[in-house]
Amino acid sequence: MMEMKYRLWACLLFLPMVLWASGRPKVAVVLSGGGAKGTAHIGALKVIEEAGIPIDYVVGTSMGAIVGGLYSIGYTPQQLDSMVNAQNWKFLLSDAPNPKDVLLDDRLKSERYVLSIPFSLKSVAVSDAGIIKGKNLARLFSTLTEGYQDSVDFSRLPIPFACVSENLVNGSEVVFHEGILATSMRSSMSIPGVFAPVDLDGMGLVDGGMVNNYPVDVALAMGADYIIGVDVQSPLLKASELKSVKDIFGQIINLQGEKKYRENLRNTDVLIKVDVTGYSAASFTKEAIDTLMVRG
């Protein structure tokens, strides 16, 4: 593990010299999906910045779209670190009203609807379209993207950005290059069966992880010459490891996009493969987030 980190640092430190010597090719950072594991992207962005590498594009899926979208409008890795640690994830991953905004009686009633962690179905009110409508997350994204709440061309952001979702109506990949930033980020991480799809222009948009969880091809199509990828995707499980609904559901998602994932890995110049052993998409505890950011 330590040897791999030294090799990575050497590669990143040498990269700026290569870029400048060759006439400054365009560099893209690609951030994979992975739920809570995606908080490791913040640590990786810190390392890339410390190495002095210029970033011309940022592209992401699911949690990679959240981190990437906020980074593209000027949030620093340090600010993202503070923001992630300041959140009440139990509240955000639910449709419960803000405890500060309700009376005690209503607050007690709402407790039955609070989701402890994603994929845990205890005491969760299941809607027709998904477990969580995502109102609290949508509200947070809207607040964090203040100043970018109108429809915008993502190529005109401080760092050009794109993210990936899937249209559940026909299974097609949807790449956001423009629109309302908060809506695009929310659409990219709308896990089917957990979050209700986002209705937009006749589409039912869900998490892009099943069609393109590591969207290197999107970055290349935008004009990137050099790809730095940050991958927090867990490896495929063996038969003996498929022991829970969470394991099975995660395996299905990973298998859907496995072919494209392998192709995108081959087109990556520098890969930061984060060690996510012991953590899942649902590891939103403070201790887990702190560890994942350090591993990134």
List the model feature ranges, each with a label.
Residues 12-21:
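Hydrophobic h-region of N-terminal signal peptides that target proteins for export
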Residues 1-10:
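Bacterial N-terminal signal peptides that target proteins for export
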